[in-house]
Regions:
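Alpha-helical segment proximal to the catalytic Tyr-Lys
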Residues: 127, 171-175, 237
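Residue(s) in the substrate-gating loop at a strand-loop-helix junction
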Residues: 142
Length: 254
C-alpha cells in the first residue's frame, strides 16, 4: 500500500495473536517494525522470523503499565530505527467474570493494561509525532467497548474509553499532522477468547456464538492486518477519528 515502505512502526502486544499478525504484515509492506511486549521469548521469535524474510524488526521488552519502561523502550527503538511514524496500540488483557464476582484488585489490573497502557504509550509516542508534524495511529479496541459484553464489564469500559480517546485525540492532533482511528474486533480466536470458552459449557457457548455471527466463524488474527495497513497508508490520509468494527457481521453500525 502507498506510503508504508521505509516507515517505522511500533506495535504493542506484537509478540502474539493479532499483534504478531500485524507486525508480520507491516514488515511485508516495507515498514521497520518495533515489537513492544512483555513476552521476550515470543517477541524475539517474531522479530527473528521477520528478519529471516529479509525485513526489519526488533523486539523491545516493556510493561505498558509502566510509563518509564515505555519511555525507555521507545527511546531504544528510535535510537536504532529512527522516529516512530506509525503506532499500533494492540496490547490487552482480560479474564471473563461477572462484575459482581470481581474485586477492586482485578479492576485495577484490567484498567492498568487496557486503558492506562495505551495512555502511556500514546503520551510518549504522540509527543514526537506532533513535533515532527506527521503520525498515524491505529488503536485496537473491541466491540465490547461499543456494544458491551457479558462477563467483561471493566474490559468493556476500558475499550469504550479507548474509542473516546481516539476521537478526542483525532480532534486535538489533526492540525499537527497526526491522524488516529480505532479498529474494534469481534470474537477472535486468540488466547483470551479460548480462556473464556474452556470446558463443555464453553464449547456450547462457542457454538451458539458462531451461529450468531453471519459469517459463521470467529475472527482469526489474520483478519485484521490488512485494515491496519490501509489505515496507516496514504490511501487513508483523509480518514481520522473513525471506529471500524471487524466482526463477521455480528455487530453492524453506520
Amino acid at each position: 500500500m502507498r506510503g508504508l515502505n521505509d516507515r517505522t512502526v511500533l506495535v504493542t502486544g506484537g509478540a502474539n495473536g493479532i499483534g504478531a499478525a500485524i507486525a508480520r504484515r507491516l514488515a511485508e509492506e516495507g515498514c521497520t517494525v518495533g515489537i513492544l511486549d512483555m513476552d521476550a521469548a515470543a517477541g524475539d521469535d517474531i522479530a527473528g522470523e521477520i528478519a529471516a524474510r529479509g525485513r526489519r524488526a526488533s523486539f523491545h521488552a516493556a510493561d505498558i503499565t509502566d510509563y518509564q519502561a515505555v519511555s525507555r523502550a521507545v527511546e531504544s527503538f528510535e535510537a536504532a530505527s529512527g522516529p516512530v511514524s506509525f503506532l499500533v496500540n494492540n496490547a490487552g488483557w482480560d479474564r471473563a467474570q461477572n462484575f459482581l464476582d470481581t474485586a477492586p484488585d482485578f479492576w485495577r489490573k484490567v484498567v492498568a493494561t487496557n486503558l492506562f497502557g495505551p495512555l502511556n504509550v500514546s503520551h510518549v509516542v504522540l509527543r514526537g509525532m506532533a513535533a515532527r508534524g506527521f503520525g498515524r495511529v491505529v488503536n485496537i479496541a473491541s466491540d465490547a467497548g461499543r456494544v458491551g459484553s457479558s462477563g467483561e464489564a471493566v474490559y468493556s469500559a476500558c475499550k469504550g474509553g479507548i474509542i473516546a480517546l481516539t476521537k478526542t485525540l483525532a480532534r486535538e492532533l489533526v492540525g499537527k499532522g497526526v491522524i488516529l482511528n480505532t479498529i474494534c474486533p469481534g470474537p477472535t480466536d486468540t488466547a483470551i477468547l479460548r480462556s473464556f470458552l474452556e470446558g463443555a459449557e464453553g464449547a456450547r457457548i462457542a457454538e451458539g456464538l458462531k451461529r450468531a455471527i453471519p459469517m459463521r466463524r470467529f475472527g482469526v488474527p489474520e483478519d485484521y492486518p490488512g485494515l491496519v495497513a490501509f489505515l496507516l497508508s496514504d490511501d487513508a490520509a483523509y480518514i481520522t477519528g473513525q471506529t471500524i468494527s471487524v466482526s463477521g457481521g455480528l455487530t453492524m453500525h453506520g
